[in-house]
Amino acid sequence: LFHDTIINNVNLGDVSISNEKVEEALRDAGAWAFVESLPEGVDTVIGERGIRLSGGQRQRISIARAIVGDPELLILDEATTALDPQTEERILRTIGNLTKKGITAVAVSHQTAVLEIADQVFKLENGKFEAINN
C-alpha cells in the first residue's frame, strides 16, 4: 500500500473508476465498515505500507484494489490469513460470487475455509503438484 488516501490506494489514481465503484469494492472486501468509521473516510491517508491500519485492514484494502477493476483472473496468495473468521467468510463469499460472474480465481492458502469455495483443489507437497478430488 502507498502513503496516500484509501481511495487512491484502491483505484490507483485512475479517475475513470468512480467513487461508487470504489465503495462497492470496499464493501465486497469487508472493508467499508471500518473505512466509513474513519474521520476522513476514503480520504484518510493510511501511511507508508498502510502502517496506520491493522494487518487485516491492510489485506481488505488490497483485496478491494484487486476487485475494483472487474478482473478476469484474480490470484490470491494467503488473502484471508490475517482476518477474523467473520471477515474471512465474507471475503470468501465475495470471491465465490466473483467466480459466478465468470472471473477465474486462483487462491493459494493454508486456510481450509478456502476449500469451501473451490471448484478444484490442488496440493503441492514435496515438490509434487497433484489434483485432489473435491
What residue spans do the PLM features occupy?
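Conserved catalytic segment of ABC-fold P-loop ATPases
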Residues: 116-123
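ABC ATPase nucleotide-binding domain helical subdomain, centered on the C-loop/LSGGQ "ABC signature"
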Residues: 7-48, 92-93
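Helix N-cap at the start of a conserved alpha-helix in ABC-type nucleotide-binding domains
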Residues: 85-87
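Catalytic Walker B motif of ABC-type/P-loop ATPase nucleotide-binding domains
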Residues: 74-77
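Conserved H-loop
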Residues: 102-108
